[in-house]
Amino acid sequence: MSTSANRSTPSARTVFFISDGTGITAETFGHSVLTQFDLRFKQIRLPFIDTLDKAHDALRKINDAYELDGQRPIIFSTLVKANLSKVVRQSKGMHMDLIQTFVEPLEQELGVKSTHTIGRSHTSTDSEEYKNRIEAINFSLAHDDGQSNKNLAEADVILVGVSRSGKTPTSLFLAMQYGIKAANYPLIPDDFAREKLPGGLLEYKSKIFGLSIAPDRLAEIRNERLPGSKYAALANCRYEVNEAEKMMRREGIRWMSSTTKSIEEISATILQEIKSEHRTD
């Protein structure tokens, strides 16, 4: 009997990224730290916590997660206002305050007070970059999971792969960090039966990049969402992954496995492919 079949999978640790702005700074730092650990995390972003009411609401969500999980949530915070940070610190989570950890010691070292403008732009170049990122985020959200075929010509990359192979988080990471307009489309059994890519993608095949994943890991992830379903069954996961990889090879699509890769590593590979493509244009 397989020992892996009997081994219980530890529940994902809940992580909150809290900010009185977009939360991108807290999330970026948090991701960099969390990727050092070979564990699963349930990540929740709470942006624009800029009033006491919102801070107390965040406090309730953190404490609810503690009661539900039976373990302390981890909190990455860039709350600038002390009164808001004080409320969140009363939670039952482990609090990682980026302001207190980094900004306050630098204030002492430099002998000046910070402007307390985490995430704000200081130059016209920064403003343009911020605008590009927001546009990319909106594009990625509008084109998540095959929601829309509109304006695909604007996409920098189109990710394809079976459901839960990492397309959505990769798309959003590319948008938030690099201003990359990334659409993503699931490859589903109907596509395998037709032996064709989802409708509307053939015209943009040069923009497509595929993500695959080991079937056993895919089954684990899907069972967290729909335990005991055909969708999450290992046999079905093997079928979908095999068919998706066959399709990508048949269509000449570049692809990689996301099984052991962090979002940062996947994104770096895609960025390299995009830059290489632009150099050859």
From Swiss-Prot:
Q: Which domain of life is it from?
A: Bacteria
Question: One Pfam annotation, family name?
Answer: Kinase-PPPase
Give the InterPro entries listed for this entry: Kinase-pyrophosphorylase (IPR005177), PSRP (IPR026530)
Catalytic activities? [pyruvate, water dikinase] + ADP = [pyruvate, water dikinase]-phosphate + AMP + H(+); [pyruvate, water dikinase]-phosphate + phosphate + H(+) = [pyruvate, water dikinase] + diphosphate
**What Enzyme Commission number(s) apply to this enzyme?**
2.7.11.33, 2.7.4.28
| UniProt keywords, alphabetically | Kinase, Nucleotide-binding, Serine/threonine-protein kinase, Transferase
Question: GO molecular-function annotation terms?
Answer: ADP binding; ATP binding; phosphotransferase activity, phosphate group as acceptor; protein serine/threonine kinase activity
Question: Which residues take part in binding ADP?
Answer: G161, V162, S163, R164, S165, G166, K167, T168
- Kinase among keywords: yes
Instruction: Kindly give the PANTHER family that the UniProt entry links to this protein.
Output: PYRUVATE, PHOSPHATE DIKINASE REGULATORY PROTEIN 1, CHLOROPLASTIC
Q: What's this protein's family per the entry?
A: Belongs to the pyruvate, phosphate/water dikinase regulatory protein family. PSRP subfamily.
Q: Which NCBIfam families match?
A: PRK05339.1
* Reported function: Bifunctional serine/threonine kinase and phosphorylase involved in the regulation of the phosphoenolpyruvate synthase (PEPS) by catalyzing its phosphorylation/dephosphorylation.
Protein name according to UniProt: Putative phosphoenolpyruvate synthase regulatory protein
Protein's organism: Herminiimonas arsenicoxydans
